From Swiss-Prot:
Organism the protein comes from: Saccharophagus degradans (strain 2-40 / ATCC 43961 / DSM 17024)
Reactions performed catalytically: L-homoserine + succinyl-CoA = O-succinyl-L-homoserine + CoA
Principal localisation: cytoplasm
Source taxonomy: Bacteria, Pseudomonadati, Pseudomonadota, Gammaproteobacteria, Cellvibrionales
The name this protein goes by in its record: Homoserine O-succinyltransferase
Catalytic residues, chain numbering: 157 (nucleophile), 324, 357
Gene behind this protein: metXS
GO terms, biological process: homoserine metabolic process; methionine biosynthetic process
């Protein structure tokens, strides 16, 4: 009987739930008395516990990076193309860890969870978070796993922000920091996109100020529109043009035809929004986008990014994509310039791609694969 999964996949994986009773002091002054983290791991931790790789997920990501949850599972983890045997993050060499961040909606403690103080879902009362709060929970997970130092901390987009925060706040606990399609802070335009998405959610009559679960409803329409807005910014004009152009899904422009015309891109966006609203939580979306907005790596260093990076002692890989206008290459070059001014070891790659911000997730990009693989092969275990 043939194997149910591709040979270069990690195959069947089972998430693990870790419970923490130690109170977590948050950056906003509030705290969580206890919390849970949903985690997946791939590969084997070596005897020295020196081959650990932490992957930090982005806005809509989760702990499910690679592999399948059942033999009938048709959709692998979100980074399946880059994590597994013989892939850039090679599970034959590395012990790979990813957790669903707190505030998430894939098993870790978040707005959908029951608040032990009330016995009801947290909803709107769940505290807003900062990137450093996620890093603190990741540190505690590393301690639980017995990993004193990661071989590398890796992340794309919001995940890259977490990786950089690791490098500054826990410099002795990672040897390499891989930052893909990210930035040291958001531009005004980026914040504007996030606020527009939040307004779409909050304008849904089923939002109920974030306490929709208490009303036994969900703001699916608002979340769907928010996802449509976000998804447009993750693509590129060239990429959308090549994939959809002005092709029609229905109707025509023939004279005398008054049927409503639907473009392929319209149908695609509605599908993306609808499917996302079935699996993601609106409060989590608001929380995650605010964490993005609030992040500023150099804020505590008087805006001097080089001074901030002087706190780091690891080596860096920074990657950008030419068509990414949400986290444009110049934002990655700002990171590289600051690292060089701080006299830190950095490799930079700018990849030609039509896939926009989502390029860091997209398979079959040879130069990206080669750069990523070459760097990770240098990571000592």
């Amino acid at each position: 009987m043939p194997a149910p999964f591709p040979e270069d996949s990690v195959g069947l994986v089972t998430p693990q739930l870790f419970h923490f009773d130690q109170p977590l002091a948050l950056a906003n002054g509030r705290s969580l008395d206890s919390y849970e983290l949903m985690v997946e791991t791939y590969g084997e931790l070596n005897a020295e516990k020196s081959n650990g790789i932490l992957i930090c997920h982005a806005l809509s990501g989760s702990h499910h990076v690679a592999g399948y949850h059942s033999e009938d599972d048709k959709k692998p983890g979100w980074w399946e193309h880059y994590v597994g045997p013989g892939k850039p993050i090679d599970t034959n060499r590395f012990y790979v860890v990813c957790m669903n961040n707190i505030g998430g909606c894939h098993g870790s403690t978040g707005p959908q969870s029951i608040n032990p103080a009330t016995g009801k879902p947290w909803g709107s009362s769940f505290p807003f978070l900062r990137v450093r709060d996620w890093v603190e929970t990741q540190v505690r997970l590393a301690d639980r796993l017995g990993i004193n130092q990661w071989a590398a901390v890796v992340g794309g987009s919001l995940g890259g922000m977490q990786a950089m925060r690791w490098a500054l706040e826990h410099p002795n606990r990672l040897r390499h920091c891989v930052v893909i399609a990210s930035a040291m802070n958001l531009t005004a335009q980026n914040i504007a996109f996030n606020e527009t998405a939040r307004q779409a959610i909050q304008s849904d009559p089923n939002f109920f100020n974030g306490d929709y679960l208490a009303q036994s409803t969900l703001p699916k329409r608002g979340l769907s529109v928010a996802r449509m807005i976000g998804h447009i910014t993750y693509l590129s004009d060239d990429g959308m043009g090549k994939k959809f152009g002005r092709e029609l899904r229905s109707g025509s422009f023939d004279r005398g035809n008054d049927q409503l015309v639907e473009f392929q891109i319209e149908s695609y966006l509605r599908y993306q929004g609808s499917t996302f609203s079935e699996v993601f939580d609106a409060n989590t979306y608001i929380l995650m986008t605010r964490a993005l907005d609030y992040f500023d790596l150099a804020r505590e260093y008087n805006g001097d990014a080089a001074e901030a990076f002087k706190q780091a002692s690891c080596k860096f890989l920074v990657v950008s994509f030419t068509s990414d206008w949400r986290f444009a290459p110049e934002r990655s070059r700002e990171i590289v310039t600051a690292l060089m001014r701080a006299n830190r070891d950095v490799v930079y790659g700018e990849i030609d791609s039509v896939h926009g911000h989502d390029a860091f997730l997209v398979p079959n990009q040879l130069r990206y694969w080669e750069l990523f693989s070459a760097y990770m092969n240098r990571v000592e275990v």
